[in-house]
Amino acid sequence: QLERDYLPHEREARIAGKPIMGVGAVFPISNWPTYQTGDYKFKEMPDVQRVIAMDLGLINDKTVISLMYWHPYEQEAWLHSQVVVKGIDEANPMSYINHLLRPEVFGCPIVLPPDASTVGRYTMSSLSLRQFLESYELNVYPDPIRNPPYSEGRITNIKSYGINVMRQMIEMGTFRINENCQEFIHEATNYHVDPQGRFSDPDDAVDSARYALLACLNGWAEPYDGMTPQQRMATARDRIYDIKDRLHQ
């Protein structure tokens, strides 16, 4: 009967006890668009940008740090890596700050949720997490994560917006997931919404990826040129001096 009534991926989901379309599944994906590290040479790809997003958790949740690459003209995204911090460690940012200070990601813009500005909430100190990260000279985007504005300029924080965009891109194959992001794939495979519109838990990895995608859609990602902020500033100064020299010739 399963073979007669359901498609192959629906049969697999039912046998595994996973939600499928029609019973609240958010990502009814049979073949996830995954890739392996090394499949894409992001540093050599023209116009590629990148951003880091953080979903913050306390003792019973996870803190998830996502690195995403983005092609603004092709509207393609790559969820390249996720660092998942669980348990007591996530309440202390010193346990994961080193992931943000690594040379290969230092200087990458970091986007945070609104409550990252709450003093002591995620730091157990007199600093907010935003202030804590800024004290390490990290490139923290000044505004909290939000949905892109509508055509009339109105801004909302409706969660379903980012989820729906992510689902559509996954279905089209323009949102690719590094196969190492198993936490995301596990959460997304089991992600569902109830009749009242409430999304299931856990969704920390999904939310972190959603924040990164929203940052890309807002135009907050920055070009991936392999430079540090200091090198970018030096290059900008050289460019300005060159322009001035030409004007005075």
Spell out what each predicted region is.
Residues 69-73:
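Short loop/turn segments immediately following beta-strands, especially the blade-tip
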